[in-house]
UniProtKB/Swiss-Prot annotation:
Protein's name according to its UniProt entry: Ras-related protein Rab-27A
Modified residues (N-acetylserine): 2
Source organism of this protein record: Sus scrofa (Pig)
Lineage, broadest ranks: Eukaryota, Metazoa, Chordata, Craniata, Vertebrata
Binding positions (GTP): 16-24, 74-78, 133-136, 163-165
Subcellular location: Membrane; Melanosome; Late endosome; Lysosome
GO MF term set: G protein activity; GDP binding; GTP binding; GTPase activity; myosin V binding
Motif Effector region, residue numbers: 38-46
Name of the gene encoding the protein in the UniProt record: RAB27A
């Protein structure tokens, strides 16, 4: 797909404590590579990827492919950048929330990140996929899978154990998030309403500031 040759531009935000592997996961997804020498993200960065999304119809048939331009925003996990990070929450349509399977505190902080999303995202029930990263470091693991899955079930969000080093479940996690977003858009009664994190190929968003309160209750929020 050439520049501008897409149906939707969709913004994802990767969140989580510093050092959980957000940059490495996004790099693995967009480039299929792992770089163990990434330095800590300062502020905000992003990567891009073009994909084709095909949804199954009610009869099981695969529908027309939607051409998606994904912007994957990479945020700093340090507390001193928190105000900058939260400023980007409303502009994103979906959230990839990561913790480090070898760092219990990063898992305990997942609740705080979700609380921040509920306060600052485009609606109180945004689409989130939870990822326990660094699954390849099994001998260093301190967070049990059943504990992480239990937390995800409490919030009603999908959970994957990922590895930026070998690519395990990285694409699946992001594809699941995209599927959630596209289905949310399909549920919109008024198809002219699309959250601010989605831009049509003509460059227009459909958010109307005069109807912001009405929009907060739209599309399954």
């Amino acid at each position: 797909m050439s520049d501008g040759d897409y149906d939707y531009l969709i913004k994802f935000l990767a969140l989580g404590d510093s050092g959980v592997g957000k940059t490495s996961v996004l790099y693995q997804y967009t480039d299929g590579k792992f770089n163990s020498k990434f330095i800590t993200t300062v502020g905000i960065d992003f990567r891009e990827k073009r994909v084709v999304y095909r949804a199954n119809g009610p009869d099981g048939a695969i529908g027309r492919g939607q051409r998606i331009h994904l912007q994957l925003w990479d945020t700093a996990g340090q507390e001193r950048f928190r105000s900058l990070t939260t400023a980007f929450f409303r502009d994103a349509m979906g959230f990839l929330l990561l913790f480090d399977l070898t760092n219990e505190q990063s898992f305990l902080n997942v609740r705080n990140w979700i609380s921040q999303l509920q306060m600052h995202a485009y609606c109180e029930n945004p689409d989130i996929v939870l990822c326990g990263n660094k699954s390849d470091l099994e001998d260093q693991r301190v967070v049990k899978e059943e504990e992480a899955r239990g937390l995800a079930e409490k919030y009603g969000i999908p959970y994957f154990e990922t590895s930026a080093a070998n690519g395990t479940n990285v694409s699946l996690a992001i594809e699941t998030l995209l599927d959630l977003i596209m289905k949310r858009m399909e549920r919109c009664v008024d198809k002219s309403w699309i959250p601010e994190g989605v831009v049509r190929s003509n460059g227009h968003t459909s958010a109307d500031p005069l109807n912001e309160e009405k929009e907060k209750g739209s599309c399954g929020c």
